[in-house]
C-alpha cells in the first residue's frame, strides 16, 4: 500500500479524556475515531488489525470443532425475561420498544438467543455435544465509558456456547476451550495468565478469566510463582492465616467497657493484642430485584471485605454503603456490632473464623465489646468466603507466597451448567429416553478489546509497538527525500518485490519532511522500517526495528537475505 493512497489521519494532540496509552496512541495514529460516548469507528489501520485478530480467533475455534453462526444484534426481551436475567443485568442492558410496543434488548451476551436457536431442534443426546460461536457486535450501556476500547459501550466479541448431555462432557469442552484460548493469545504474542474468576451476572460454576499482564490493567490478580495458581482478586483464595502473637484469654463472652473504641486499630491497642484476634463487622445495604435490606459481614479484624464475594454470599444484585440513619433504624451501633444476640438482621461470617476461639468483637451496645468469643455452634450456611486476598498471603494450593499483578481481562470461559436450560425449558432426551435440560458452557473473548490490550502491553513514550502477527503492516519503506530519483526508484522496485512475496508493506511516498515520516512510523508502530536516503550512494540503507528503535545499516546486496530472516 502506498501512503499517498492510504487513509490514516494522524493527530498531534491526544483526546482530552484519554489517559491510557492505548487510547492516546490508537486515536492519534488513526486506528480508531470516537464518534460518541463509548462509541468508536475503526479506520483502515484499525480494521486491518481487527481482521487479523478475528482470523486468529476463527482459525482456532474452527480447529477446536466449533461452528460459526451469526445471530441478530437485537434480542426479544421475552427471552431475557424467560431466563430471569432481564432485571438482574441492570441498566447496562439497553432496553427499547419498536413502533408496535414490542420490547427488545441490545445483546451484551447471547446465552438466551443461542439457547433459543437449538431449543426443540436438538432433541436427542445423539446430537450432542454441539458448540456454536459468533464474532459480532455487542452493546453494554456502561455508566462511565472510559479508557477507549477497554471500556466502551459497543464492542466486537467472539461468544461461543456449547451444549452437552452431561457434566463430564461439559468439563471436557471447558478444558478444550482453555487450551484454545491459550493458543489464541500465544499466537498474538501476549503475556497472559488464566485465572480463577467470579462468574458475575452470567452465572454458572467453573469460571476462568484470561488476563493479559499490563501495568495499566484495571484488574488485580494474584499469582503463585511456585505453582500454576492464579486468580482475580474477586475470587482469590488463600491458605488459612495463622498468628504467633499471644491470644487474649477470658471467660466466654465477657462484656468489657471500651469507651469510644470504634475502630479495629484502637481496639487492638486498647487490649494490646494483634488485630488478628478481633472480629470486624462491615454493614452493607444489599439491593435485590424487589427490595433492599441491611446485611452484616463479619471478618477478621486484620482482613478486608471483598465486596464481590460478599455480594455473592447474600445473592444481591448490588451492595452499597449503609448510612448512619439506616444503621440506627436497624438497631445497629456503629463500631460495636457483633453476631452474639444479633436479631432480625442477615449476617455472614468469613469461613476462616469458623471454630476460632478467644476472639474479641462488638457487644451490640455502645462502648462495649465482648471478649472470649468462640465462633462455634453456628449455622454452617452463615460461613462464606468473604475476605480479600492480598500479596504476601499464602497460596491455597501449594503454600508459597502470592504476588499481586495488574491485568486486563480479554477472555472468560464459564461452566453454566443447567441454569439457562432449566429456566428456558430447553431439554433433550437422554440415552434412557428421559427428558433432561442441556448442560451449557459459555466462552467469550473481546476481539476489539484485544486491539487496545496489545498496545497497553507493548508501547513506549513515542507510540505503538506492534508485533509481526498483529501489525497492520510489517514493514514501512521511508524515502527520506522524494527529490532523490535514484532513492525513489529503488524504493518503488523494493516495494513491488516485497509485495509480490506476500509481505504487508507500506511505502511512505508522501511529500512530507523526513521528521514527519519518522514521527508517524514511531506513532503507528509497525515492526520495521527501511529508510532509503543518502546512504544509497554507498549501497547502504537503514533498517529500524520499532521495539527499542534499534538501527542497523545494511548493504543493498544483503537486504533480501536479512529481510527474510527478520521480517518475513
From Swiss-Prot:
It is an enzyme of class 6 (ligase). Its EC number is 6.1.1.15. InterPro entries: aa-tRNA-synt_IIb, aa-tRNA-synth_II, aa-tRNA-synth_II/BPL/LPL, Anticodon-bd, Anticodon-bd_dom_sf, Pro-tRNA-ligase_IIa, Pro-tRNA-synth_IIa_bac-type, Pro-tRNA-Synthase_IIa_type1. GO terms for molecular function: aminoacyl-tRNA deacylase activity; ATP binding; proline-tRNA ligase activity. GO terms for biological process: prolyl-tRNA aminoacylation. It holds the Pfam family tRNA-synt_2b. It catalyses: tRNA(Pro) + L-proline + ATP = L-prolyl-tRNA(Pro) + AMP + diphosphate. GO terms for cellular component: cytosol. Homodimer. Belongs to the class-II aminoacyl-tRNA synthetase family. ProS type 1 subfamily. HAMAP family: Pro_tRNA_synth_type1. This is Proline--tRNA ligase. It comes from Campylobacter jejuni subsp. jejuni serotype O:6 (strain 81116 / NCTC 11828). The lineage of its organism: Bacteria, Pseudomonadati, Campylobacterota, Epsilonproteobacteria, Campylobacterales.
Amino acid at each position: 500500500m502506498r501512503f499517498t493512497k492510504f487513509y490514516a489521519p494522524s493527530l498531534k494532540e491526544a483526546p482530552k479524556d484519554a489517559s491510557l496509552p492505548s487510547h492516546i496512541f490508537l486515536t492519534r495514529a488513526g486506528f480508531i475515531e470516537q464518534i460518541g460516548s463509548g462509541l468508536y469507528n475503526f479506520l483502515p489501520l484499525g480494521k486491518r488489525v481487527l481482521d487479523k485478530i478475528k482470523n486468529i480467533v476463527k482459525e482456532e475455534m474452527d480447529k477446536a470443532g466449533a461452528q460459526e453462526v451469526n445471530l441478530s444484534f437485537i434480542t426479544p426481551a421475552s427471552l431475557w425475561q424467560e431466563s430471569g436475567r432481564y432485571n438482574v443485568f441492570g441498566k447496562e442492558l439497553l432496553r427499547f420498544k419498536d413502533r408496535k410496543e414490542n420490547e427488545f434488548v441490545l445483546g451484551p451476551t447471547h446465552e438466551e438467543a443461542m439457547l433459543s436457536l437449538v431449543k426443540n431442534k436438538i432433541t436427542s443426546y445423539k446430537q450432542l455435544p454441539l458448540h456454536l460461536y459468533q464474532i459480532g457486535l455487542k452493546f453494554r450501556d456502561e455508566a462511565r465509558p472510559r479508557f477507549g476500547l477497554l471500556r466502551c459501550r459497543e464492542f466486537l466479541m467472539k461468544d461461543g456456547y456449547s451444549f452437552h448431555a452431561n457434566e463430564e462432557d461439559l468439563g471436557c469442552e471447558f478444558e478444550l476451550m482453555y487450551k484454545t484460548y491459550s493458543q489464541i493469545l500465544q499466537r498474538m504474542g501476549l503475556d497472559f495468565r488464566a485465572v480463577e474468576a467470579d462468574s458475575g451476572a452470567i452465572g454458572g460454576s467453573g469460571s476462568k478469566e484470561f488476563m493479559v499482564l499490563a501495568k495499566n490493567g484495571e484488574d488485580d490478580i494474584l499469582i503463585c510463582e511456585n505453582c500454576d495458581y492464579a486468580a482475580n482478586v474477586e475470587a482469590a483464595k488463600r491458605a488459612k492465616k495463622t498468628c504467633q502473637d499471644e491470644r487474649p484469654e477470658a471467660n466466654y463472652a465477657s462484656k468489657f467497657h471500651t469507651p469510644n473504641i470504634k475502630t479495629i486499630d484502637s481496639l487492638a491497642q486498647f487490649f494490646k493484642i494483634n488485630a488478628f484476634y478481633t472480629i470486624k463487622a462491615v454493614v452493607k445495604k444489599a439491593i435485590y430485584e424487589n427490595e433492599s435490606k441491611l446485611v452484616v459481614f463479619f471478618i477478621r479484624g486484620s482482613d478486608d471485605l471483598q465486596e464481590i464475594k460478599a455480594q455473592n454470599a447474600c445473592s444481591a444484585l448490588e451492595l452499597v454503603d449503609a448510612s448512619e440513619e439506616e444503621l440506627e433504624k436497624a438497631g445497629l451501633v456503629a463500631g460495636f456490632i457483633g453476631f452474639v444476640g444479633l436479631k432480625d438482621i442477615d449476617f455472614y461470617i468469613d469461613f476462616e473464623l469458623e471454630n476460632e476461639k478467644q476472639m474479641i468483637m462488638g457487644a451490640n451496645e455502645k462502648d462495649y465489646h465482648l471478649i472470649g468469643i468462640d465462633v462455634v455452634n453456628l449455622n454452617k450456611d452463615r460461613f462464606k468466603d468473604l475476605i480479600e486476598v492480598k500479596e504476601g498471603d499464602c497460596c491455597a494450593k501449594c503454600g508459597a507466597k502470592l504476588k499481586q499483578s495488574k491485568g486486563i481481562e480479554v477472555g472468560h470461559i464459564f461452566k453454566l451448567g443447567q441454569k439457562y436450560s432449566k429456566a428456558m425449558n430447553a431439554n433433550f432426551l437422554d440415552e434412557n429416553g428421559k427428558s433432561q435440560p442441556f448442560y451449557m458452557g459459555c466462552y467469550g473473548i473481546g476481539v476489539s478489546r484485544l486491539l487496545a490490550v496489545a498496545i497497553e502491553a507493548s508501547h513506549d513514550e513515542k507510540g505503538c509497538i506492534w508485533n509481526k502477527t498483529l501489525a497492520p503492516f510489517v514493514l514501512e519503506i521511508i524515502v527520506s527525500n522524494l527529490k532523490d530519483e535514484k532513492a525513489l526508484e529503488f524504493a518503488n522496485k523494493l516495494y513491488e518485490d516485497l509485495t509480490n512475496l506476500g509481505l504487508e508493506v507500506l511505502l511512505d511516498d508522501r511529500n512530507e519532511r523526513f521528521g514527519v515520516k519518522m514521527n508517524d512510523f514511531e506513532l503507528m508502530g509497525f515492526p520495521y522500517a527501511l529508510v532509503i536516503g543518502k546512504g544509497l550512494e554507498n549501497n547502504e540503507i537503514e533498517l529500524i526495528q520499532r521495539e527499542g528503535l534499534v538501527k542497523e545499516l545494511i548493504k543493498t546486496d544483503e537486504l533480501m537475505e536479512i529481510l527474510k530472516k527478520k521480517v518475513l
